[in-house]
From Swiss-Prot:
It comes from Dictyostelium discoideum. Zn(2+) 1 binds at C322, C325, C342, C345. A zinc finger (RING-type) spans 322-360. SUPFAM superfamilies: RING/U-box. It is a multi-pass membrane protein. Belongs to the pex2/pex10/pex12 family. InterPro entries: PEX2/10 (IPR025654), Pex_N (IPR006845), Znf_RING (IPR001841), Znf_RING/FYVE/PHD (IPR013083), Znf_RING_CS (IPR017907). Residues 1-82, 136-165, 217-243 are peroxisomal matrix. It catalyses: S-ubiquitinyl-[E2 ubiquitin-conjugating enzyme]-L-cysteine + [acceptor protein]-L-lysine = [E2 ubiquitin-conjugating enzyme]-L-cysteine + N(6)-ubiquitinyl-[acceptor protein]-L-lysine. This is Peroxisome biogenesis factor 10. GO terms for cellular component: peroxisomal membrane. Residues 1-82 are annotated as: Disordered. The chain crosses the membrane at residues 83-112, 114-135, 166-181, 193-216, 244-263.
Length: 374
């Protein structure tokens, strides 16, 4: 019976399920272990990848930020001004300085009289330029030309605003030094006639300096080169600026040609002197010839002064021209408004239109007054 029961129990389905359930659960657990390990490894790998990516992203972002910072820093430093803007600024300043010089000259003429101020035109010009300089550069502001072109003076290589000693130095080299040199050169040439060659060297040196400016655009004037002051832009310049290299090259060619012609003429003159000295044979006669040459140079300087006086007379003749015929006035006639014309010109004008040609004041032939011994 027991055997039968055991057999029956063994073949009973519920018993089989109960007996197999523990083994089945353990098998399921064992079978489920490898997948969990694989999933954990995959998760760990994914976490490591995320960490690596998160570590790389800040580095890339930092590099991009550094590049942007470098670009921004490069934009913080303004660029140097170019030749066209510097020339335009200088021309604008010269225009306003000329107007101011004329006004100062008229004011001084009324105060001191025309005879006194005509002999001191250079001093009146220096006074006007000094006032213009004190009202602009000396107080640290821009000149009218610099404002027009958005330029600013700075110390080269430091990008700092010029200090008061730098401005005083610029004023001395720009205004006082040329005035003192111009006043002292005639006396220097009288004492040392051999230094007369400086009068021809200085203009060539100035043209050479101008050629260098056309090449590199650094210093337009000697005063700014000696005081180490340059111009920068107040605005951002995106477009390319034109260059004046061709003008600099042409100036250098002109300087070389003029120097060659000058040396050629002097060498020919020296050869003639040597030949004349060989024929004479005495050293004392050579010294006399040299003294004669020095006297000739002094006479040339006197002739040059006379030529300057003639030029001044020509300017006065230009002021005495009639505004209608543009020639020197003949039989000078004054109108009621005070303008001067030729008698023939103003009478013909009054026959057509009874108005002054200059100010349109009503006039007639009866009111025109001829000026005798004028």
């Amino acid at each position: 019976m027991s055997n039968v029961q055991s057999q029956s129990n063994s073949h009973h389905p519920v018993h089989n399920i109960v007996n197999r359930s523990p083994t089945s659960r353990s098998e399921q657990q064992i079978r489920s272990i490898p997948p969990t390990n694989n999933n954990n490894n995959n998760n760990n790998n994914s976490i490591n990848n995320i960490n690596n990516n998160t570590q790389r992203q800040p580095l890339n972002n930092n590099n991009n930020n550094n590049n942007n910072i470098n670009r921004n820093n490069s934009n913080l430093y303004p660029s140097y001004a170019d030749q066209p803007d510097i020339l335009r600024s200088s021309q604008k300043d010269e225009y306003y300085k000329k107007l101011f010089e004329d006004q100062c000259f008229e004011m001084l003429t009324r105060i001191t009289g025309p005879r006194f101020i005509m002999n001191r035109q250079s001093e009146s010009k220096l006074l006007a330029n000094t006032i213009y300089y004190l009202l602009t550069t000396m107080i640290g502001s821009q000149t009218l030309g610099e404002e027009y072109c958005n330029l600013r003076k700075i110390k080269d290589k430091t990008f700092s605003i010029p200090s008061i000693p730098d401005r005083i130095k610029l004023y001395f080299f720009h205004l006082l030094a040329p005035y003192l040199i111009k006043k002292s050169l005639p006396k220097l040439f009288q004492r040392h006639p051999k230094l007369y060659i400086l009068k021809e060297i200085f203009p060539k040196f100035e043209r050479l300096h101008l050629a260098l400016f056309y090449f590199n655009g650094s210093y337009f004037e000697f005063s700014k080169r000696l005081s180490d002051i340059r111009y920068i832009f107040n605005r951002k310049i995106d477009q390319k600026r034109p260059k004046y290299d061709i003008l600099g090259l042409l100036i250098i060619i002109q300087i070389l040609l003029s120097t060659f012609m000058y040396l050629k003429e002097n060498s020919f003159f020296l050869k003639q002197q040597q030949k004349d000295g060989g024929c004479n044979g005495d050293g004392e006669e050579d010294n006399q010839d040299l003294n004669k040459d020095i006297k000739i140079e002094q006479v040339d300087s006197v002739i040059n002064n006379n030529n300057q006086d003639q030029n001044n007379n020509q300017e006065e003749e230009e002021e005495q021209k009639c505004t209608l015929c543009l020639e020197v006035r003949t039989h000078t006639t004054a109108t009621i408004c005070g303008h001067l014309f030729c008698w023939h010109c103003i009478t013909e004008w009054c026959n057509n239109k009874e108005q002054c040609p200059v100010c349109r004041c009503p006039i007639s032939i009866r009111t025109c007054v001829p000026l005798y011994n004028y």
